[in-house]
Amino acid sequence: MKHRYYPILLLYFFQVACMPEEDLPIRHTGETPEYFIECYCQPGRPFALSATSVLPVSEDLQIDFSKEMKVTIHADKAISLIPGSEFIYNYGSPEKFEVRYIDSLFLDITTIDNKSITASTSIPPAVSIYNCQVAGNEAIIRFYISEKADENYYIYTAEAVHADSILNKEVCYLDYSEFQQEGLTEKSVILPDIGQAEEIIFTLKRITKANYDYQVSLNAANTANQSSITTPVPLKGNLQGALGIFTCYTEDKQTVPL
C-alpha cells in the first residue's frame, strides 16, 4: 500500500532567511521516508542549511530536524556545517561564503542511515538594480540583463512597509533566458496598500535556473494544495537522494521613502 508523506518544515520559524519566496507545501507522496533539504548560499553571508525527515502521514506531526547528518559544502575548501539552534536553519557555519577562484559549490551529506545526498550549483554573477521608482500604486524596477542565458533568471520582490510591518508584498519570477544580448529592462508590480506605506523596499535576486524551476514548482504546489488535498505537485529540486534545493544567488536591494 502506498503511503503519503509530509515534509515537516515550518519555514515561518526562519523568517530571517532570504529564501524561499513561497512557503513550503505540506504534502508529498512517496513509497519510503525521505529527507528534505534546503540550502541557499549567498556570497558574503554564513552558510546555512535546513535538513529534516519526511514522515508518513500516520505519524504525529512534529518538528523533527535531524542532527545526525554529516554535512559538507565544498567551495575553495571543504566547509563542515554543524547542527545548532543558533543558526538560521538547523545546520550552519560561522564561516562566510567568499567567492574567490571558484564558480560552483558542491554539497555532500551522509545521513544517520548512511544515505548519500549530493548536489551542485553554479554561482551567479553579482546583480545590480539600475534604478527604481514608485508611480501611483506601481513599484517599478530597472536593471541590466545578461547576454548569457543561464544568468537571466531573477526574483523581483516589492514590499510596502509601514512602521517595520509589511503591508503588502509582491513577488515576480522572471525568466529572461531567451534574450540574446545585454540590455536594460524594467518590471512593475501593483501594490494595493502603497498609499499607507512609509517606504517601498525593492529586492532583486539573480538566481540559477535550478532555483527558478524550484521556486515556480513550489508556487504551483501551493496553489494546487489550496484547491485539492489529493493531487500533490512534485517539487523540481536538484538534489540527488532527497527533496529540496541546493543553490546560490546574488542580491541587490534599494529603499524608496514615500
Per-region residue spans from a language model:
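Sec-dependent signal peptide recognition
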Residues: 2-9
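N-terminal leader/targeting signatures
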Residues: 9-10, 242
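Compositionally biased amphipathic helical and low-complexity segments enriched in hydrophobic
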Residues: 10-12, 175
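C-terminal motif of bacterial Sec signal peptides marking the signal peptidase cleavage site
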Residues: 14-17
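A sequence/structural signal for flexible, mid-protein segments enriched
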Residues: 19-258
